[in-house]
Regions:
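Short alpha-helix adjacent to the SAM-binding motif of class I
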Residues: 1-6
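Conserved SAM-binding strand-loop segment of SAM-dependent methyltransferases
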Residues: 7-19
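A short acidic, Gly/Pro-enriched loop at the edge of an enzyme's catalytic core
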Residues: 17-29
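A short glycine-rich, Lys/Arg-flanked "PGG" loop and its adjoining helix->strand segment in the class I
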Residues: 42-54
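Core SAM-dependent methyltransferase catalytic element
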Residues: 119-140
Length: 140
């Protein structure tokens, strides 16, 4: 209804699907603060790659984390809170699912890059950051 009100109803649709069951081809596929909670992030990234249009983009928004755990704890004021929440919520959730990789909310850019490279992406970059989030772009 809101898409119609905004004048975008002719080019917008909504569907309920999980990260490995949606159909179609997309210019942009987004994951907002969610990939680290998923048991099979490599498989999910691979599924996204298979559903991207030519020159399509995956936009990944994840909690801000530095790659080195010790530096993350000293230089990231949110790290202690996010490690605590991740240990209690995110990681157990991921471990309970198929594959159970358990990335957690403080995976960091290098680990996320590795996930997307394993899924067949060849370009991965930090598009932006805030004190709370990394905004990452992956392309084939």
């Amino acid at each position: 209804l809101r898409a119609d009100e905004a004048g975008a109803g002719d080019r917008t649709s909504f569907a309920v699907a999980d990260a490995k069951s949606y159909e179609g081809t997309y210019d942009v596929i987004c994951f907002f603060d969610s990939l680290h909670d998923m048991g099979d992030p490599v498989g999910i990234a691979r599924y996204a790659r298979e559903h991207l249009a030519d020159d399509g983009t995956v936009l990944l928004v994840e909690p801000f984390a530095l790659d080195d755990r010790a530096t993350n704890m000293t230089d990231n004021p949110m790290a202690a809170l996010l490690y605590t929440a991740s240990s209690s919520i995110c990681t157990p959730n991921s471990l309970s699912q198929e594959v159970g990789l358990g990335l957690g909310a403080q995976a960091g850019e290098a680990r996320l890059r590795d996930v997307f490279e394993q899924a067949g992406f060849t370009r991965f970059r930090r598009a932006a950051e805030t004190p709370l989030n990394l905004i990452l772009e992956a392309k084939v």
